[in-house]
Amino acid sequence: MNLISSYKTEFELLRKFIEEEEERKETEKVAQKLANIFTKGKKVLICGNGGSNCDAMHFIEEFTGRFRKERRALPAISISDPSHITCVANDYGFEYIFSKGVEAYGQEGDMFIGISTSGNSPNVIKAVEQAKAQGLVTVGLLGKDGGKLKGMCDYEFIIPGKTSDRVQEIHMMILHIIIEGVERIMFPENYVEE
């Protein structure tokens, strides 16, 4: 067992992401777009399965609560309510649990973020399709080769990790960078001393 080797792989993924100019520009574009969306009184919706669902919930609480410094709460929804998920899964099928949430909460001009470490989650694919049909800006946090979701979103981050845990770790870093970017744009006074 070589745990250090495993973490070296993770750091190599992280290093590649950080050094990739296109990825940095894409992250900045998403942060700017989301700041504009919030400024217009719109919101962000996000979803994922398993650990990615936890990442989605972590992302929204940083907006509805706070990230680093005091500021007003920002409108963010994770499609993760257990009663919604079990109702839709029972009545329509598991592949509709997120798209029905997008249908209910999404409005034209909002942002939707779908997280899938494989890029092949049927329920995330359907949610992206629903978001696009309703005029939401779409962002995909994907893994491996991007799977079926590759090319479906307005903005994409494809992390070519071999295991879901390593992909999720980079996804969470991307989400934190987006949050910080939004705060720096909307609340520059909070970052004056840096």
Swiss-Prot record:
Subcellular location, record wording: Cytoplasm
CDD domains the UniProt entry points to: SIS_GmhA
Involved pathway(s): Carbohydrate biosynthesis; D-glycero-D-manno-heptose 7-phosphate biosynthesis; D-glycero-alpha-D-manno-heptose 7-phosphate and D-glycero-beta-D-manno-heptose 7-phosphate from sedoheptulose 7-phosphate: step 1/1
Domain of life of the organism encoding this protein: Bacteria
Keyword Oxidoreductase: no
Binding site for Zn(2+): H58, E62, Q168, H176
Major localization listed first in the record, in broad terms: cytoplasm
PROSITE patterns, per database record: SIS (PS51464)
GO molecular function: carbohydrate derivative binding; D-sedoheptulose 7-phosphate isomerase activity; zinc ion binding
Co-factor requirement: Zn(2+)
Protein name listed in UniProt: Phosphoheptose isomerase
Source species of the chain: Fusobacterium nucleatum subsp. nucleatum (strain ATCC 25586 / DSM 15643 / BCRC 10681 / CIP 101130 / JCM 8532 / KCTC 2640 / LMG 13131 / VPI 4355)
Gene encoding the protein: gmhA
